[in-house]
Each structure stands twice: as structure tokens, then as C-alpha cells.
Amino acid sequence: AYSDDLDGLRKIPVGFPDSLEEHLAKPVSLIPDPYGCHDSYGMHMSSILLDGLDKVGIKYEFRRAIDTYKQGLLKDQIHTILQNNTKIGDKISELVGQEKYQKYLPYFPVCANCNRLYTAESTEYIIDEKKVKYRCHDTEIGSKMIKGCGHEGEADITKDLGKLAWKVEFAARWTAFDIRFEAYGKDIMDSVKVNDWVADEILECPHPHHVKYEMFLDKGGK
């Protein structure tokens, strides 16, 4: 069981307090638990999944994204991916029509000034120093504009907190953790298509076998 708890908060879930508004775009593992029962909002949400797995008796190994990145378990893959960012950006455009990564690197540093993730977009990789240059600016997430703080800085991929974009992160994890099989939902089909190519051609590690599943529906049918 892998928790993507370094992903940023994109919106406030129904039923959660409005106090989370100030934390939009921050990694969920750096947001205080609004109910005070876990070390972060991210761990609060992960506990719901883990409780379900425990109740049905599923055996699992639990990994957190924040620990994976802090421990440097993906640093070699990040370096290789960023070295090939131009090639990857062009391939993403070719495979799924997304042009964003022809302009920005597929890596989000956590802004050193405001702790937001998605507002800090990196534009250049300094290969010999293993640092990305970034600027924190206004970014639209869903239908909401999130204000950036304007900070410009550099982030060391071996020390400073940050994460790969989903279009390349799966490939890095598959390679680092020797993943041979991974199922995925049809909503992330484009990401899997790109990650398969990144694993095979950039990281030179065969992508895992896949099974695609349909969407899970909640009680409201969403």
C-alpha cells in the first residue's frame, strides 16, 4: 500500500473544515490534521485505507511518499529523468497531447517560502549540482486559481523536499522498488502510457505487467 502523501491538496473534501483553505496546494503530509488524531491530514486520510485493509485481513507493506523522497530512494531515477527532460516533454506531447512539460520540468519542488507544491514550477535542471531552478507563481488547480508567493529559488533534488510529476513518477517507483505488476484505474490511463515509455526507454527498466480496472463509485455514485 503506497500513500501519495507528498501530493498537494487540490480541494477541500466535503465535510472537512474550511480551515484547510489556507493549505491548498501544500503537500498533504505537511498539513496539520484538522481533527488532531494523526500527525498530518495526509496520514489521517491514509489511516482510512489502512483500516479497511486491516478489517478484511489483507497483508500489505505500507510506504509513504514523503518518506520515500526524504530517504532519497528515488534520487537516481529523478536525476536520470531530469537529464532527459526535453526528450520526455516531447514524448508526453506526442503520446497524450499535453504540452506543459515542454515548458516546465516534470518535477515539483516544495516552495521554500510558502510550502506549496503545484505553484512552484521548475524551469531548468543544473545537472552537475543536481538542482532545479523554480519560481512560485499563480497556478490554476481545477477551476480555482491558487496564488503563488513569487519566490524564486533553487532546490537540491538530493536534499530538498519535492516530487516528480505523475507522468513520470510511477516509472521511478517501479524501477526503485522492482515492481513487476501494477493494476491501474482507467482515469490514469494516459499517465500509465507515458510511464511505461519512461521506464522502458529512459530508465531502461521494463515496465510492469498491468491490469486496467473501472472506476470505483462512492455512495453518491461519483
Predicted regions and their residues:
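N-terminal Rossmann-like or analogous alpha/beta NTP/dinucleotide-binding catalytic cores
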Residues: 1-89, 195, 201
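Conserved Walker
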Residues: 93
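Alpha-helical recognition segments enriched in aromatics with Gly/Pro capping
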Residues: 84-87, 96-222
